[in-house]
Structures are given as C-alpha cells and as structure tokens.
C-alpha cells in the first residue's frame, strides 16, 4: 500500500478514536452527578444552569449575583460545582429529598462551606468514609469528593446518621445501579428544556392528586407519570407537560378524546374580540361532543333543560369545525352588569335546525317563564328570569351569547390585533386558551393587598395549548423586552 495513503488512513483512525474518546469523556463528565441519583427515585429534576441563564439572557455579572444569592453569601465568587453540567434533584421512595452536582473544584466548594459556617449556616467540614461532610442549617447533610457532591434531607439526630449511610451508598453506586438505567429516567432524557422533571403522580400534593384522579376518572394514580419541561423564549416562560401512563383504560380514554378534539383549522381566529379576557378554541364534530357532554350528570341535566325550549341537541349536532368561546370582562362576576359577557361561535355543517324555529317560538309561548322572539329568520332572543340570551347563524357560523353588544357585533371575519403572535401557532393544535391576567391580578391586589400573585403582573396573559390529548404547553407571555425572568429571579 502507498505510504501516503497508509499515513492518511492511520491519521483518520487516530482522529476518529480521539473523537470517540473525547465524546465518551464528556458524556462521563456530564453524567457524574446522575450517578448519585437512586434508580428507585419517584421524582427527578434536571437543571442545566448555564443553558437556562443563556436563554434568559443573563450577563456574567447577573449570573454571579444569582450564585451569591443562592449561596447566601456575597463573598462567594465561584460555587465549586460545575454549572456546565446538569444538576439533579430527586425524591427517594422513602420521601427524602436530594440534590446531586458535579464538582469542578473541591477546594473552592470547601471554602464556600467555610463561609457558610462563619455565618452560622453550616458545621465544620469533617472527613468520613472517603468523603468530606457538613450539615447545612442543621438538617441538610452534604458530602462531596473531587468528582461529585450530594445534599440530602431534611433529617436530624439518629435519622441523620442513617441518612449518612444511605448517602455513602449513593455516592459509591455504579452507573448500572443509578437512575440512568431506569425506564423512569428515559422519559426525562427525552425532555430538552433547561429545567426538566419526571415524577410519579403518587408523589404529588394531595390536592393535585385528588384533582387528577377526578379529571382522569381513575381510582388510582399507579403507573401514571408526569413529565415537565420549563424554558424561556424571549419574553415567554414556557412549561411543557406530558401525561405518561400504562393504564389500559386511561390510554384508551386519551385515544378517544384525541378523536373528538381534532386539529384546529383557524377558521375563527380573526373573530376574537380585542377586549377578550378569556378566549378558547377547539375543533369538534357536534355529535361526538354531545356524546361526551352527556357523560357528565350536571351537563346532561342542563342539556335536558335547554331542550325544553330550543332543540339544542339538533343545533349541536350541526356543528362541524372550529368552536370558540370568549369572555370579554369581569362585569358579570362582580355584579356590575346583569348581561353575561360570554359568546360562543361554532362552524356549522348545516343549518337544518333553523327549520324548527316556529316550533321553538310556540313552545316558549306555552311556557310562562320563557319568551322567544325572532329578529330575523336566523337571529333569536330568548328571555328568561329577567335575563336574555341571543343566538343565531351568520355565514354558516352559530353564535350564542348573553350580551347584546356581542350579539350585535360584526359576526363576519374582520382582522384585529388580538393574538397576532399566536395566530399561526394555533392551527394544528387540538385546544387553545388565552387568559388576559392583568385585570385579574389588579383586582386581586385591590381587594387582597400584596400577594405572591403580584408576580403575575409582569405578564400580559397565560396561554394553554394542547397538541395531542395528554400533552400540554402553558406559556406565560410578558411585554416585549421586559426581561421577565431576571425580574422574577433577581427581584429587579
């Protein structure tokens, strides 16, 4: 073989081998902290600190300020742990909380603990079983070596001695023994946000567990996990949530709902009222939606009541396409107005139900509590209990509202400035909702004073998106250029 060709082949082989070795070392380094996470953990959170700070546009100075804030000391220049590698938090099957991080300088970490000791927040470092140890605020036990650090608790007294033994086992376990080899962790690995989490539904707070069981119609949360991802996009804080289950009945229910809530076409986006407090949209076939509504006792009773005057079932069966609901103000809730500022719009397959309008009017006339009037062959007003409801059809779109102003508003498509940024994203989703939170937070602040909800005033609205049933995205949307994440974290 030609010596030149041989040299090229050897060089290429060495380059490939070197690349593989470097990649393996980087992977090994990146996963050092993961090696201390137990395989039996019921919840795991992964935090990519530098990615999060980069996405939130933190400067070096602001990043340093955040570290000092977290370490409760202005004297700390570097944390001693590698913030370019993931930090893991977890909950054990016994309910212990833990945090694992990769160490990049054990001496710096020890020095930082000495600063905390001088402030009365940590005990003097002692060496035991091959690791350095310190108790932070008496109930959080920390151990570290040159590779990784582990913090666990809360625990005191004899329980802390038992925890120390458990921590030694976690620090010494192999890759095969840690969470990295568990199917549970694989769900977390699929999340690419700078902050990601996977949790067994059973470890959630009782209130949330009860709500989930009620909404999912299950008697147990066994074999149900929630995967979460949090990231920032300019002036948006985004949370992605996935419901993961092996329960056969629940999987079938989610599949059925996926068939009912079809991809949104965007047919009614331009009709959103610019003053909408709440706006929702989905795409359904009326007959399937009616079957779903009848499964809920309260809604089934309400439908029976509506059908005594108007054939609401027939009206609903004609729906085929995008459906929107909107609430334009809090006036009704506060008792300032008797008219309900809510409107429903729905694309129709047909208008056959209008053929029953003469029968509706006769039925209402025979019922003293109701009065039904037709302003046009396709527009009606129903009066009952000193209230009124307007409904009808315009351009093959059904409208139903409790407000005369919304009933008389232009029902044809007219471009407006509302939801301009989201308009292209709405198409293809199975559900979308947008809530203007400014009026709500101002109202709460007015009557309740300062509360943790004041932070919501930094945002304009909250959007809820559903791709497939079981996958949700919540977006907190702030004014452009507001640096909302910095304001929340640094308190600016």
Regions found by a protein language model. Name each.
Residues 45, 79-183, 324-425:
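Single conserved position on a long alpha-helix in the C-terminal lobe of the eukaryotic protein kinase
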Residues 185-188, 207-208, 248-250, 256-357, ...:
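Extended non-catalytic domains of envelope/secretory-pathway proteins
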Residues 1-5:
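Positively charged n-region of N-terminal signal peptides that target proteins for export
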Residues 16-18, 174-283, 287-290, 427-492:
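Leucine-rich, highly hydrophobic segment in Treponema pallidum outer-membrane-associated proteins
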Residues 30, 69-75, 114-142, 198, ...:
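A cross-kingdom feature marking solvent-exposed beta-strand/loop segments within repeated
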Residues 7-22:
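Hydrophobic membrane-insertion alpha-helices, especially the h-region
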Residues 22-44:
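Ser/Thr/Pro/Gly-rich low-complexity linker/stalk segments immediately outside membranes or between
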Residues 41-67:
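Short extracytoplasmic
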